[in-house]
C-alpha cells in the first residue's frame, strides 16, 4: 500500500456525508459513494439539537444553518382534542446558554445541501450502487452496478436501513415493520390560521397516534408535519406510497381545529413505513464498520435518528484521529464502546414514543457533546 490508507464511505445520506466531511477536514483520504444520480430537495423536515449543531460547527456550516433554520423557543406537547399543554420544553436562548449551541428545525434537503457543499470537490461520486463486496486481510474491493471497482483499506457502511454492507456482514434480513406509518408533508404555511395556535414546534398526542409539526425555514413560510399512525400491514417492496387528504381526515377525525387546518392546507402527502431492527450483535468486522440506520434504525419519535448517525460519524472520526488507521480493529472496538449504549438508549425511547410527552429533563440527549465525552473501553457488552 502506498500513501495514506483509503477510506470509502458507502451512502451519502446525512450520516455518510457528515462522516466524509469530517474525515476530509481531519486530513484523511476519503471518498463518498452514492447510488442516486443526484440529490433533490426531498419533502421532509429535521430537528437539529445542540448535540448535532456542535458537530456542524466542526464542518463549518453552523452559522448558515442558524440563518436558514427556524429557532423554536419551546417544544410543546399538546392534547389531541383540547389542545391543552402537556409539556413545554425550553429551547431557544435556553439551549444556547445551557447546552452551548442552538436548537433548530430546518428542511432536510436544505441541510443536506449545505453539508454536501462542504465536501471537497471530487470527493462525492454519484451513480455508485454497491452490488458486491470482496475483502481480504489488506483491502476491501467494492463492485458497483456501473461496472467499476474501487478499493479501500477502511469501508464505512452508511447505506441506511436496507444496508448492503450490513447484509454482507450479517446476512440478508428484512427490517421489522413496526405496525405504524408516517405521513409526511411540507407546504407553505397557511395564511388564514387566524387565532389557531400554530406553535413553532409542537407534537399533538393521543393514545395511539400523533402529529409532529414545525417550521422548516427561518422565515416560517414553510411548515412540515409528520405523523405516527397505526396500520396493520405494509408491502415491504415499497419504500413509500402516496397518501391523501381524505386519508388524513379519517386518521385524525375529531382532532383539534389546528390539526384540521393543517390537513386542509396540505397539497400533497406521502406515507412511509416505520421500520426497526433489533440491536445488532456487531457493528464491524474485518475492515468494514457500520453507522447510523445501517446498524441502529429507529422510529423517528425522538427526532434523533439522523442525529445518531451524525454523532456516529463524528465519534468515528475522533477515534481515527486518536488511534490512526493501522489498527482498525482496535479503532472499531473503541467506536462501538463509545456509541452502542447511547444509540441503543435512543432506539428504545424512540420505540416507546414517550419522549417529551411530559415535562422531563432532556439534558442526557441535547447536552451530549461527542467531542467532550471521555472515551471508555469495554462498554459495548453493556449496551
UniProtKB/Swiss-Prot annotation:
<keyword id="KW-0732">Signal</keyword>
<feature type="binding site">
    <location>
        <position position="47"/>
    </location>
    <ligand>
        <name>FAD</name>
    </ligand>
</feature>
<keyword id="KW-0560">Oxidoreductase</keyword>
<dbReference type="GO" id="GO:0009056">
    <property type="term" value="P:catabolic process"/>
</dbReference>
<comment type="similarity">
    <text>Belongs to the 6-hydroxynicotinate 3-monooxygenase family.</text>
</comment>
<feature type="active site" description="Proton acceptor">
    <location>
        <position position="214"/>
    </location>
</feature>
<feature type="binding site">
    <location>
        <position position="15"/>
    </location>
    <ligand>
        <name>FAD</name>
    </ligand>
</feature>
<keyword id="KW-0058">Aromatic hydrocarbons catabolism</keyword>
<dbReference type="GO" id="GO:0043731">
    <property type="term" value="F:6-hydroxynicotinate 3-monooxygenase activity"/>
</dbReference>
<keyword id="KW-0520">NAD</keyword>
<feature type="signal peptide">
    <location>
        <begin position="1"/>
        <end position="26"/>
    </location>
</feature>
<dbReference type="InterPro" id="IPR050493">
    <property type="entry name" value="FAD-dep_Monooxygenase_BioMet"/>
</dbReference>
<dbReference type="GO" id="GO:0071949">
    <property type="term" value="F:FAD binding"/>
</dbReference>
<keyword id="KW-0285">Flavoprotein</keyword>
<comment type="subunit">
    <text>Monomer.</text>
</comment>
<feature type="binding site">
    <location>
        <begin position="306"/>
        <end position="307"/>
    </location>
    <ligand>
        <name>FAD</name>
    </ligand>
</feature>
<comment type="function">
    <text>Flavin-dependent monooxygenase (FMO) that catalyzes the decarboxylative hydroxylation of 6-hydroxynicotinic acid (6-HNA) to 2,5-dihydroxypyridine (2,5-DHP) with concomitant oxidation of NADH, a step in the aerobic nicotinate degradation pathway. Is also active on the non-natural substrate 5-chloro-6-hydroxynicotinate, and is much less efficient on the substrate analog 4-hydroxybenzoate.</text>
</comment>
<feature type="binding site">
    <location>
        <position position="108"/>
    </location>
    <ligand>
        <name>FAD</name>
    </ligand>
</feature>
<feature type="active site" description="Proton acceptor">
    <location>
        <position position="47"/>
    </location>
</feature>
<dbReference type="Pfam" id="PF01494">
    <property type="entry name" value="FAD_binding_3"/>
</dbReference>
<feature type="binding site">
    <location>
        <position position="293"/>
    </location>
    <ligand>
        <name>FAD</name>
    </ligand>
</feature>
<protein>
    <recommendedName>
        <fullName>6-hydroxynicotinate 3-monooxygenase</fullName>
        <ecNumber>1.14.13.114</ecNumber>
    </recommendedName>
</protein>
<comment type="pathway">
    <text>Cofactor degradation; nicotinate degradation.</text>
</comment>
<dbReference type="InterPro" id="IPR036188">
    <property type="entry name" value="FAD/NAD-bd_sf"/>
</dbReference>
<dbReference type="InterPro" id="IPR002938">
    <property type="entry name" value="FAD-bd"/>
</dbReference>
<feature type="binding site">
    <location>
        <position position="130"/>
    </location>
    <ligand>
        <name>FAD</name>
    </ligand>
</feature>
<keyword id="KW-0274">FAD</keyword>
<feature type="binding site">
    <location>
        <begin position="34"/>
        <end position="35"/>
    </location>
    <ligand>
        <name>FAD</name>
    </ligand>
</feature>
<keyword id="KW-0503">Monooxygenase</keyword>
Amino acid at each position: 500500500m502506498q500513501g495514506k490508507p483509503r477510506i470509502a464511505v458507502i451512502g451519502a445520506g446525512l450520516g455518510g456525508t457528515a462522516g466524509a466531511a469530517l474525515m476530509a477536514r481531519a486530513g484523511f483520504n476519503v471518498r463518498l459513494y452514492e447510488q442516486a444520480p443526484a440529490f433533490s430537495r426531498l419533502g421532509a423536515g429535521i430537528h437539529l439539537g445542540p448535540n448535532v449543531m456542535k458537530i456542524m460547527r466542526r464542518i463549518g456550516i453552523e452559522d448558515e444553518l442558524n440563518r436558514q433554520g427556524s429557532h423554536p423557543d419551546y417544544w410543546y406537547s399538546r392534547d389531541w382534542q383540547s389542545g391543552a399543554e402537556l409539556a413545554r420544553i425550553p429551547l431557544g436562548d435556553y439551549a444556547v446558554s445551557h447546552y452551548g449551541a442552538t436548537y433548530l428545525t430546518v428542511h432536510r434537503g436544505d441541510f443536506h445541501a449545505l453539508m454536501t457543499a462542504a465536501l471537497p470537490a471530487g470527493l462525492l461520486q454519484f451513480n455508485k450502487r454497491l452490488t458486491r463486496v470482496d475483502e481480504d486481510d489488506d483491502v476491501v474491493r467494492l463492485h458497483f452496478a456501473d461496472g467499476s471497482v474501487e478499493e479501500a483499506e477502511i469501508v464505512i457502511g452508511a447505506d441506511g436501513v436496507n444496508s448492503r454492507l450490513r447484509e454482507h456482514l450479517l446476512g440478508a434480513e428484512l427490517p421489522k415493520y413496526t405496525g405504524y406509518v408516517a405521513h409526511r408533508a411540507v407546504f407553505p404555511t397557511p395564511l388564514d390560521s387566524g387565532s389557531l395556535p400554530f406553535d413553532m414546534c409542537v407534537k399533538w398526542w393521543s393514545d395511539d397516534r400523533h402529529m409532529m409539526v414545525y417550521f422548516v425555514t427561518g422565515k416560517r413560510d414553510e411548515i412540515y408535519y409528520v405523523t405516527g399512525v397505526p396500520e396493520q400491514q405494509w408491502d415491504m417492496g415499497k419504500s413509500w406510497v402516496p397518501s391523501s387528504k381524505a386519508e388524513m381526515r379519517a386518521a385524525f377525525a375529531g382532532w383539534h381545529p389546528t390539526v384540521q387546518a393543517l390537513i386542509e392546507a396540505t397539497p400533497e402527502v406521502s406515507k412511509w413505513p416505520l421500520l426497526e431492527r433489533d440491536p445488532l450483535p456487531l457493528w464491524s468486522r474485518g475492515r468494514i464498520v457500520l453507522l447510523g440506520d445501517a446498524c441502529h434504525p429507529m422510529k423517528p419519535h425522538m427526532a434523533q435518528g439522523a442525529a445518531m448517525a451524525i454523532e456516529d460519524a463524528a465519534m468515528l472520526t475522533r477515534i481515527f484521529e486518536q488511534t490512526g488507521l493501522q489498527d482498525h480493529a482496535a479503532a472499531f472496538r473503541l467506536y462501538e464502546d463509545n456509541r452502542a449504549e447511547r444509540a441503543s438508549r435512543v432506539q428504545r425511547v424512540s420505540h416507546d414514543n414517550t419522549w417529551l410527552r411530559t415535562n422531563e429533563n432532556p439534558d442526557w440527549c441535547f447536552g451530549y457533546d461527542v467531542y467532550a465525552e471521555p472515551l471508555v473501553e469495554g462498554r459495548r457488552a453493556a449496551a
